[in-house]
Amino acid sequence: LHGVAMILFAADNHYGTHAGQNLFECLRPHHEIHFREDDWRCLVEENLAVTYDLLMFHLIGGTCDVPAPGPVAEQQVKKYLQAGKPMFLLHGSSAAFWQCAWWRSIVGFRWVRKDDPDGFTPSSHPIRPYLVEVAKSRHPLCQHLQDVAQPADEIYINLEQSCPATTLMTTTTEEGTFPMAYETITPWGGKIVSYLPGHAPTAVRHPGNVANCRSIIEYLITPT
């Protein structure tokens, strides 16, 4: 019998918004989540792939006056992914290990910071209310996602696509149509789902936003 899925959720304070913490508070009644903020010791554990069924991030490496996760954390996360395990990346987490070339190449669409090691122009985030819509796609997860009318919040646009990805949700703004949720398969066969909405507390706690995150978690922890 498959026991309760164990989830490790590592977040930074995200510029004082505590976005990861806010999402954790909404998810904790439904899932078994080991949450840590601004503390990467949880990532240096041996055998993350044995202990956890899912790794979640809401962090951008080296921001918020918190040192980036170090080389040991990086290696343990890589070992977890090399075991074919799934990962859920929230908001800017495609840049969790942005200094590492191997990481940048596997996350699908990635948030590009200034002084990008690969030389791409930075991504941007206009702030205004926006509608996140389920993509026109036969991906099974799309049947379990819902459109969300977000309050004024950061809209992540102009990300760089570093590998093939299936778009699950989009938004259309005056700048164009951009992916807001997407899946990519790692070189080791594991699933990575990214969900970009969720900076301000009101956006993170939006019931539609929480429901989408719950659906993504269920998808990622369900054995195929």
Describe each model-derived feature in a short phrase.
Residues V50-V66:
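Short, structured active-site "lid" loops
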Residues H18, E25-E32, T51, G119-S194:
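Catalytic beta-strand/loop cores that center a nucleophilic Ser/Cys/Thr
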Residues A10-N13, R36, P71, W98, ...:
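Extended, composition-driven regions rather than compact fold-specific motifs
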Residues L1-L54:
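Aromatic-Pro/Gly-enriched surface loop or interdomain linker
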Residues N13-Y15, G61-C64, S93-F97, H199-P201:
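Solvent-exposed loop/turn segments at secondary-structure junctions
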Residues G3-V4, Y15, P187-T224:
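Extracellular ligand-binding/catalytic regions of CAZymes and related secreted enzymes
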